[in-house]
Amino acid sequence: MSAIAIEISARVCDAGGAAAGGDGEAVGKGAIGARVPLVVQTAGGSVTLLTRDADEALLLRARIDAWLTGSADDFRDVPLAEGTAFQQACWRACCSIPRGETRSYSWLAAAAGSPRAARAAGQAMRRNPMPIVVPCHRVVGSGDWIGGYAGDARQSGPTLGIKRALLQLEARSSDVNSPAS
């Protein structure tokens, strides 16, 4: 029986906790906020469960760390391990949304090639395997309705504060990184 190689990396930030896992080929799972039980145990360190390519996992962690402190990384080159063709198209389109900006689910559906599939685009965001790498917090409802986050569609759910915190973090770092007028 062959072992499956998985690296799990966790970090605590202003928006909550973030964790990523993958097999050395592609990122398979990521979580943020309450969905990251390892964050409490590791307090920002990492736990390796059998890894084929620790360097790649450490590089992704370093990139996420840099993003959390203001780097404008769009993560478009990070391969994702799951998802239908439409979900993958939505996730890649989401990665094209500039830091500090938002787009609607309708925009996302159109950018993914299915302009009439706003609800399906919302479901793709709900199934996002890697929050931050695929910045689903940048996708909002029409009229800037904030919507759910990290699979929690409730308007009063605990992850909604994380979505707001990530948007505020990006707004602050966008203000700091933009040239003075």
Annotate each language-model stretch with its function:
Residues 1-115, 169-181:
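Basic nucleic-acid-binding alpha-helical/helix-turn surface characteristic of O6-alkylguanine DNA
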Residues 84, 101, 114, 123, ...:
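Gly/Ser/Thr-rich helix-start
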Residues 116-131:
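Regulatory, non-catalytic segments
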Residues 132-139:
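Short Lys/Arg-enriched helix C-cap and helix-to-coil transition segments
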Residues 142-181:
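…primarily DNA-binding HTH/wHTH and HhH modules…
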